[in-house]
Amino acid sequence: QELPEVLADLVAAEAEGYDHVLFAATTLGKAAMPRVAALLDRAAISDIVAVKGPRTFVRGIYAGALLATVETTEDVVVATVRTTAFEGVASIEAAAPIEPVACPDANEDAQFVKFTEVQSDRPELVSAKVVVAGGRGLIDETGFKALEELADGIGAAVGATRTAVDMGLCPNDWQVGQTGKMIAPQLYMAFGISGAIQHTAGIKDAKVIVAVDKDPEAPIFEVADYGLVADGAETCRALAAKLAK
């Protein structure tokens, strides 16, 4: 199992001779990249969403509410890249070579203990084409139970806001947003989600956003392609019941 402490030591040791050291903006990448930048004594750039030149990039600021074009003068660019902001590259015959390297001495500050995989028949949240998500507006576990039934009925992954996670309504690995997972589904359906910028930062690359919330002034409607002013929990239950028939 990869640990950011060990990965950072390995990457820093192999970085000589390279002018770009890039990580995907995943949980592991976000944890390892700053460590590598510190070991190399270089300034870092986080969450790149577009490339303007070898040392000029576009990144989100203010939880993705604004985009900033930044240029670095560092001789080695150390950065994380938001993979959902880029289209996948078609397969090509000349793939980049993969070279094994020797691992440095184990980092005594961190040790891998155990990895417990969450078993689920649903699609992976970060790669799902359809995601249904719930927030505080679903109120309790029964609202999220209806959300799960809806997801299973249409073959979708399940997401949630940080508030819902903090309330104990759903597991942490469902969290979508700046401090959770960045996703780019074809369809994102939000039930009872007001639309804090920390959450909407994680769904900016969704192709179609459908929002259901009883507050007509909820910020989620500003980013939604389709909106319904209604109780998120009741709407979710009604859709789940309709699918069950």
Annotate each language-model stretch with its function.
Residues 1-245:
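N-terminal glycine-rich FAD/FM-binding segment characteristic of electron-transfer flavoproteins
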